[in-house]
Amino acid sequence: MLRLLLLPLFLFTLSMCMGQTFQYSRGWTNGKRSFNAASPLLANGHLHRASELGLTDLYDLQDWSSDRRLERCLSQLQRSLIARNCVPGSDFNANRVDPDPENSAHPRLSNSNGENVLYSSANIPNRHRQSNELLEELSAAGGASAEPNVFGKH
């Protein structure tokens, strides 16, 4: 008689354990869909008691501050790029080759990769000569159009 009572109890316990293991192995947790989907930690079910402890507001505040910091960084970058490229009274053509970049009137408009080891002209001694030869070949092949700004007009 005892075996008849223990066998269903044992099978019920075994099925509950297997079901629970299956749920957690697939990422299913109790109340997973009830949390706020805005914060990724809560959506993954890592902080079950976050609403009880008041941590949802903390995570929303951290997301807001990082977004605000990113917006501020991007706006500063945009302002610096605009200020660099839109200098009043400067006649700067991006397609024009600067004849003497070392004695340029606007050193910040010239190529400033001299201190960078990867892009320094010491690593590529014939860089300027090769680009000038290519420009001459292109202008000779193009005939009358020796202007380097041919593609900018279209």
Swiss-Prot record:
Tissue-specific expression: From late embryo to larva, expression is consistently detected in three neuronal groups: dorso-lateral neurons (DL), dorso-medial neurons (DM), and neurons in the ventral nerve cord (vCrz). Both the vCrz and DM groups die via programmed cell death during metamorphosis, whereas the DL neurons persist to adulthood. In adults, expression is seen in a cluster of six to eight neurons per lobe in the pars lateralis (DLP), in numerous neuronal cells in the optic lobes, and in a novel group of four abdominal ganglionic neurons present only in males (ms-aCrz).
Positions bearing Pyrrolidone carboxylic acid: 20
Region (Disordered): 91-119
Comp. bias (Polar residues): 109-119
MF terms (GO), sorted A to Z: corazonin receptor binding; neuropeptide hormone activity
Modification Asparagine amide occurs at: 30
Propeptide cleavage-removed residue intervals: 70-154
Gene Ontology BP, a term: courtship behavior
The family this protein is said to belong to: Belongs to the corazonin family.
Chain ranges passing through the membrane: none
Gene Ontology CC terms: extracellular region; extracellular space
Coiled coil: none
Name used for this protein in its record: Pro-corazonin
Pfam families for the chain: Corazonin (PF17308)
